[in-house]
A protein has these predicted regions:
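Catalytic Walker B motif of ABC-type/P-loop ATPase nucleotide-binding domains
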Residues: 26-30
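Helix N-cap at the start of a conserved alpha-helix in ABC-type nucleotide-binding domains
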Residues: 37-39
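C-terminal coupling/interaction segments
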Residues: 109-154
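ABC transporter nucleotide-binding domain
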Residues: 43-122
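ABC ATPase nucleotide-binding domain "signature" loop
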Residues: 33-35
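Hydrophobic anchor residue at the start of the ABC signature
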Residues: 15
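ABC ATPase nucleotide-binding domain "signature motif"
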Residues: 5-12
C-alpha cells in the first residue's frame, strides 16, 4: 500500500506514526521535505499538539522557516562538531536581529546580508532590545564569525 503513495503522503504516514507512538524522544530528519504548503501547516499543528514537558522532539532540517514557531532551542553542527547550542530566549538576549538602512554598519554587527528592504543584520544586543529570532541569519552569523559568537555565549 505504501508503495502507491506519493513522497509527501509517505512522509505524512511516517510522521503521524512517529507522533502516535507517544515516545518520550522522537528524532526526525527533514520531516517537511516533500510536503506541500498545506501539509507543512498540518505538520506544525500536529507537532505543536503532540509536544509537552515530557516529550523531546529533535528535528534535523534545512527548512527552518517551516519550524521556527515550534523551536525552543537551536543546535548548529559543523560536521560532527556542535558549534552552537542555545535556548532561543538566550539567543535574543545576546543577539539582535534587525533590518537596517544600507548605511548602518557599526562594530556591533556580526553578520549582514543585502535585501530589497535593507540590510538584514545580526548584532550584539548591547541595549537589551527585543527582536524576533531569524534562524537563517543566526546560522549564517555562526559560520561567518564562529569565534565571536562563541565568545558571546561562553
Amino acid at each position: 500500500m505504501l508503495n502507491k503513495l506519493s513522497h509527501g503522503q509517505k512522509k505524512k504516514v511516517f510522521v503521524s506514526f512517529g507522533l502516535a507512538t507517544n515516545t518520550k524522544l522522537l528524532l526526525m530528519d527533514e520531516p517537511t521535505n516533500g510536503l506541500d504548503i498545506p501539509s507543512k501547516g498540518q505538520f506544525r499543528r500536529m507537532v505543536a499538539s503532540a509536544l509537552d514537558e515530557n516529550r523531546c522532539l529533535i528535528i534535523s532540517t534545512h527548512q527552518v522557516r517551516d519550524l521556527d514557531s515550534l523551536i525552543d532551542s537551536i543546535m548548529i553542527m559543523d560536521g560532527h562538531e556542535i558549534v552552537f547550542n542555545e535556548l532561543n530566549e538566550n539567543i535574543t538576549k545576546k543577539l539582535l536581529f534587525k533590518v537596517a538602512d544600507h548605511t548602518d554598519t557599526d562594530e556591533s554587527v556580526i553578520y549582514s546580508e543585502e535585501s530589497m528592504r535593507g540590510l538584514y543584520q545580526v548584532r550584539e544586543n548591547t541595549t537589551g532590545e527585543e527582536s524576533k529570532l531569524d534562524i537563517e541569519l543566526l546560522f549564517n552569523a555562526v559560520f561567518t564569525d564562529k569565534k565571536r559568537i562563541m565568545n558571546l555565549f561562553n
